[in-house]
From Swiss-Prot:
The gene is rplK. GO terms for cellular component: cytosolic large ribosomal subunit. Belongs to the universal ribosomal protein uL11 family. Keywords: Methylation, Ribonucleoprotein, Ribosomal protein, RNA-binding, rRNA-binding. InterPro entries: Ribosomal_uL11 (IPR000911), Ribosomal_uL11_bac-typ (IPR006519), Ribosomal_uL11_C (IPR020783), Ribosomal_uL11_C_sf (IPR036769), Ribosomal_uL11_N (IPR020784), Ribosomal_uL11_N_sf (IPR036796). One or more lysine residues are methylated. Part of the ribosomal stalk of the 50S ribosomal subunit. Interacts with L10 and the large rRNA to form the base of the stalk. L10 forms an elongated spine to which L12 dimers bind in a sequential fashion forming a multimeric L10(L12)X complex. Forms part of the ribosomal stalk which helps the ribosome interact with GTP-bound translation factors. Coiled coil: none annotated. This is Large ribosomal subunit protein uL11. One of its GO terms (biological process) is translation.
C-alpha cells in the first residue's frame, strides 16, 4: 500500500541556514518529523543559494517519513536584491524607494516561471511588475 500524506508544512527558510530553532523546529516537531534529518538535507540542497529566502513544501507521510520540494525565492526578495534595497516602501503609491529595469524584471520572471501560474514570460513579467509597483519601485525601460 502506498504511503499516505498526513500533513503538508509550508515554510520560508534562509538558504543553507535551517536550524531546529523556530520556525523550523516547532512546525516539524508537531508533524513528528526528524528535524535534524530535514535541516541537514535542506542545508545541503540549498547551499548554492546563500542569502536567499527559499520557500519549501514538506510532505509528511503517515509513517513520519518526509519529502520536500524547494521553490524559487519570492518575487519580492528577488526584486529587493535587484534594486539593492532592504525593504519596500511603506506608502508605495506616494513614496518610491527604488527603480528596476524591464531587463531585471524579465530576468526575475524567467527565474520564477516554474512556480508562476503564467503561460508566457510576458505574463510573468506583468505579475512581477505588479509586485514591484506594490513595493514602491518604479519600472524603467
Amino acid at each position: 500500500m502506498a504511503k499516505q500524506v498526513e500533513k503538508l508544512v509550508k515554510l520560508q527558510i534562509p538558504a543553507g541556514k535551517a536550524t531546529p530553532a523556530p520556525p523550523v523546529g516547532p512546525a516539524l516537531g508537531q508533524a513528528g518529523v526528524n528535524i535534524m534529518g530535514f535541516t541537514k538535507e535542506f542545508n545541503a540542497r540549498t547551499a548554492d543559494q546563500a542569502g536567499m529566502i527559499i520557500p519549501v513544501v514538506i510532505s509528511v507521510y503517515d509513517d513520519k517519513s518526509f519529502t520536500f520540494i524547494t521553490k524559487t525565492p519570492p518575487a519580492a526578495v528577488l526584486l529587493k536584491k535587484a534594486a539593492g534595497v532592504q525593504k519596500g516602501s511603506g506608502e508605495p503609491n506616494k513614496t518610491k524607494v527604488a527603480s528596476v529595469t524591464k531587463a531585471q524584471i524579465k530576468e526575475i520572471a524567467e527565474l520564477k516561471m516554474p512556480d508562476l501560474n503564467a503561460a508566457s514570460v510576458e505574463t510573468a513579467m506583468s505579475m512581477i511588475e505588479g509586485t514591484a509597483k506594490s513595493m514602491g519601485f518604479t519600472v524603467t525601460d
